[in-house]
Amino acid sequence: MLVVLLIAVLLAASPARADETCMSPYMPKITGQEDYVYVWTLGVDGVGDGSDKLVTVGANPKAPGYGKVVSTVSIGGRHEAHHGDFSDDRRFFWAGGLDDSVLYIFDMAGDPAHPKLVRTIDSFVRDSGGVVGPHTFFALPGRVLISALSNDRDQGGRTALVTYNNDGKFVETVWMPEKAEYGYDVRVEPRLNRMLTSSFTGHQNYMRDLPGLMGDAEAMKHFGSTMVVWDFHARKPVQTLEVPGAPLEIRWALQPRHNYAFTTTALTSKIWLIAQQDDGTFRATPVADIADPKRTPLPVDISLSADDRFLFVDTFMDGMCRVYDVSNPHRPKLTHEQKIGAQVNMVSQSWTGEHVYFTSSLLSKWDKTGKDDEQFLKAYRWDGKRLSPLFHVDFRAENLGRPHIMRFGQDRFYKNQIFEGS
């Protein structure tokens, strides 16, 4: 246990890393320049093969494939591809479909430029006892923890946390606690033996078209308004925090003496600080408005720099990225804002903070229409003051689909690994 804690602290403190800052602390980091950005992509009818796919884009400016599509792996059909992440050894990439709850496992180690689909798990709902909508995939030692959004009884927001081992065998289901039954993201801080979960909405809402949903007063009542603090090792809830407005992505601070996390609320457009108090409990406090909440800019993804100084906040409806100085986490200061596109969703930055990547798609039925339905991966350089464009991949022109979550890969990392059974 002490060794794991020391590793987590050292990884958090190192300024030389080039991996994403939101990765599981149980996962090895890649160092130096990332070679690839892996993009889990929703299929679009009439665009290419129309299927969900894992897209590999070159990210090393010294390589011939820089800023270009290197490879694609289609899975057949459209399943609402959304989130995914690596196993604790980064050998495999686990991904899921929010609609039919199928899991996909890709081998990344054999050829990092050309991932290979090696396993499909179509028993997630049955294995888990009725959980629907696998969302966040979080690496644990020898296991993958999956947060979810819904259930198969009423397709509402009651849901659970589900664990598989790295071989794809079901381990356990832990249902969300009473009066905090909704789920979304999950993040662990090993130093504190604390896990945080957030809350969104169920299948009956997220698979509905956005204008119709927002015009349905009853449906809009069925969004989460809580975060849960867990005893991580015991998998037991210890606190329920009131965070009105659908708290989404969670980002723990990365420096070893910073015992707090950030989230944003989609419906109320606020940055929230989830901070540990002197007595060990946590308190949730709104610390900043994001743009004009009355206009519902819809905050989606966030990314915290490795030094805990900058928080990048994407807002879907206006296509903006806003960068806040959160050196004082209680008083975020807006330092930069930039239009990324007609719509923007995910943001990923390298550990050094020099490279920041954006994708455009939120959900297949929530994305904009017509000329505003831009679908892209865009790369920028961040110099601490402003974002400068590096490259742009048009996922429609490339016949790929709707790009969502991103993860980084590197040839050198895999050449230096020895995997059991390989």
Model-derived features with residue positions:
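Short loop/turn segments immediately following beta-strands, especially the blade-tip
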Residues: 57-65, 105-115, 273-284, 323-331, ...
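Loop/turn-rich, solvent-exposed surfaces of beta-rich toroidal or solenoidal domains
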Residues: 269-271, 294-377
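Blade-loop segments of beta-propeller domains
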Residues: 66-136
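Short, conserved, GDST-rich strand-edge loop motifs in beta-rich repeat architectures
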Residues: 32-49, 147-157, 198-222, 359-377
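Beta-propeller domains
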Residues: 87, 179-183, 187-321
